[in-house]
Amino acid sequence: MESELEFESQAEARSLKWEDRKLRELVTLAWPITVSTLSYSIMTLVDTLLVGHLGPAPLAGVGMGGTAAFAVLCFSFGMIRGVKTLVSQAVGAGRQDLVQAYRSAALQAAVVLGAATVAAGQLLAPLMLHLSATHEAGEATRTYFWIRNLAAPMALVGVALRETRYGEGDARSPMAATIVGNLVNIGLATLFVFVLHWGVAGAASATVIAQTIESGVLWWLGRVNGWRAAGATRQHLGELWRIGLPTALQFMLEVGSFVLLAALISSLSETQMAAHQIALQVCQFSFLPAFAVSEAASVLAGQAVGARRQELVLPVAHLCLRVAGTYTLVCSLVFVFCGRLIAAGFTSDPTLATTAVHLLYVAAVFQTFDGANIAARCILRGVGDVRFAAVVGVVT
């Protein structure tokens, strides 16, 4: 199926406001995306920090349950993220009508996929008991997974609204919603875990409420600022499917393999799983700014293609690689020289801390290379080449 934009291939090239200030535009987009993208990880990180003081079993449960919840969500997440490419190219072409149609298509897909994700998650919840070394850790995993899964529809609606705004070049509205959601999560999680003593269930419930509020705030901002979602047809839904499916399959396979690894680790001991959770949260938290830079570059590349200014794509790609590479190199050095200090923030158990530090040393090795990989794949998605990016992601 051909995109409406493909019928305009002979259209006159359009100027872009950022073509003479690429670095400024990249940073302007990237830092709010960093805050917004950190949302899911920050919420899980808060749960990890709070529950970690209850012992290894609850910590292992949050780690495995949070990973499994994201694994069930990742196909839908990857599918809906395709709207950013479509919208950025529509913005470059000056087609506001297509922006509205793609936003509507993404919201429709979010509702349907969200309901399917909840149904699948509730069926899979009993299996979580068998993904941990002890019965206590298994119960914690099942509880956390089951509750987090309930937020899937609202989380995906938030993704649809957020990715559309990214494509339009607005990263600050999603950031504002993220800040509100995370402040709510911190307050509620502290109340539920330490005051009401709800443990793992309290941490998960706080996150579900916070995710719902975050999506609600973004929806409200859209109403106030006149964002429209209308005009979606089968063609627009088909274009979202065409762009989103390769990325969705890639995410599903990547996260699926990661969950399998986490399940194997969790079957060894609570300490191994807890250490894995600490290292994972630190890596995700530190890596997402580089991911945000790559996402910002993807938006600029998409707008360049839509405006028929393909000569701008390569300079944007080179700039993205330089910025992301420098950042990930600094993170690797921090892991090596400050690993013990980082681990001490999560646990006072010396055995657990030592294991986590060793995992951070491993992360320091691949962090920079992974940053370059993500940057290249995001640029490819921005120009519409989602298949090659997906193949590389699956193979590597």
Question: Model-found features: residue ranges?
Answer:
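Small-residue-rich segments of transmembrane alpha-helices in multi-pass membrane proteins
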Residues: 179-187, 396
